């Protein structure tokens, strides 16, 4: 029984738990600046499309405002419905493009996240960590014996 207890204590002492701030490391990865540029270009194209749509609506609305006094009620009603439809299309386009931008961001981030996860796994295996926890996930207690694996992961990724 004493041998079992000694074995259990020895095994408990071998447990290595690390923590990491993946967001901090991800922002240091060189791929992020290229990703941010691609995303900015993508968002700029979408913004231009929405601005062009909005300008078209404004032009039609201004024309409508100038001419509505001379329009028959049926023509005015048709024009108002067309303007409302254009406004709905603009709102739908905005929502669609916003969802597509989020999807694009996730698509661009995935290879970077995968690379980071692979580096964390490599560090964990090389250094015999039982767990590596995300610091941003809200660890309630962190012992002074807990190891920040950030520097090891940075080294694995070639980040100084």
Task: Annotate each PLM feature.
Residues 1-16:
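Bacterial Sec-dependent N-terminal signal peptides
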């Amino acid at each position: 029984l004493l041998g079992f207890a000694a074995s259990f204590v020895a095994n408990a002492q071998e447990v290595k738990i690390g923590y990491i701030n993946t967001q901090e490391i991800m922002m240091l990865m060189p791929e992020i600046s290229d990703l941010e540029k691609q995303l900015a270009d993508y968002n700029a194209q979408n913004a231009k499309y929405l601005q062009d749509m909005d300008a078209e609506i404004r032009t039609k609305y201004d024309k409508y405002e100038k001419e509505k006094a001379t329009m028959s009620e049926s023509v005015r009603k048709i024009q108002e419905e067309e303007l409302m439809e254009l406004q709905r299309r603009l709102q739908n386009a905005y929502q669609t493009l916003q969802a597509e931008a989020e999807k694009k961001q996730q698509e661009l981030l995935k290879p970077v996240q995968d690379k980071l996860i692979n580096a964390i796994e490599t560090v964990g295996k090389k250094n015999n960590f039982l767990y590596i926890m995300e610091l941003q996930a809200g660890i309630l207690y962190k012992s002074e014996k807990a190891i920040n694996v950030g520097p090891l992961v940075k080294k694995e990724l070639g980040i100084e």
